[in-house]
Every structure is written in structure tokens, then in C-alpha cells.
């Protein structure tokens, strides 16, 4: 059990490190995606 807990802790630490690297990029991508969707909606409303 103790070894398993240690492995889990190490796994969580490396997972957190990967998340910290990925999250800023994901946030940027999400923002640009949301912006493009909002722009599309605005264009669609103007065309009606």
C-alpha cells in the first residue's frame, strides 16, 4: 500500500507539471476559439 501511495504521489506531481505546461496554451486556444465564435455570431446577426 505504501509503495502504491508513493507511486500515486509521483504520478500526480508529474501530471500537475504537465498540466501547468498545457493549461496556458489551452486557455489561449479557448479564448481565441470563443472570440471567433462570437465574431461569427455577430456577422450572422448583421446579415439577417
From Swiss-Prot:
A GO biological process held by the record: killing of cells of another organism
Gene Ontology molecular-function annotations: toxin activity
Highest rank taxon of the organism: Eukaryota
Record's subcellular location: Secreted; Target cell membrane
A single GO cellular-component term on record: membrane
Keyword Phosphoprotein: no
Keywords: Antibiotic, Antimicrobial, Cytolysis, Hemolysis, Membrane, Secreted, Target cell membrane, Target membrane, Toxin
Predominant cellular place of this UniProt entry's protein: secreted
Its job: Disrupts cell membranes, particularly those rich in phosphocholine, through formation of pores. Has antimicrobial activity, hemolytic activity and insecticidal activity.
Family: Belongs to the cationic peptide 02 (oxyopinin-2) family.
Protein name in the entry: M-oxotoxin-Ot1c
Organism: Oxyopes takobius
